[in-house]
């Protein structure tokens, strides 16, 4: 019974860490967008190239956040919930 509780706690901690990483990706994307706007203000003739590079970089970094969200959902719904049900049966 204690083992199940420890596993569920570890899943909760891991899910929290993964969600924090997704939030940090959002902060990074905002920083990149701000710097891209600054670059476009300095060099308006390069606007198309800067925007394309910014969007490509944000798409690549967003994929990490999407994968972390997928891992969190898998951990919670395929591992943690059945273990919680089992733990409640034992009580």
Region locations from a protein language model:
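Hydrophobic, small-residue-rich transmembrane alpha-helices and their short perimembrane loops
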Residues: 1-91
């Amino acid at each position: 019974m204690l083992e199940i509780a420890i596993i569920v706690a570890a899943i909760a901690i891991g899910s929290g860490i993964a969600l924090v990483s997704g939030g940090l990706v959002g902060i990074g994307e905002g920083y990149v967008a701000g710097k891209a706007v600054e670059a476009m203000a300095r060099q308006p003739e390069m606007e198309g190239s800067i925007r394309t590079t910014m969007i490509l970089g944000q798409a690549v970094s967003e994929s990490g956040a999407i994968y972390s969200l997928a891992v969190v959902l898998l951990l919670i719904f395929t591992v943690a919930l059945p273990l919680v049900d089992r733990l409640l049966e034992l009580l």
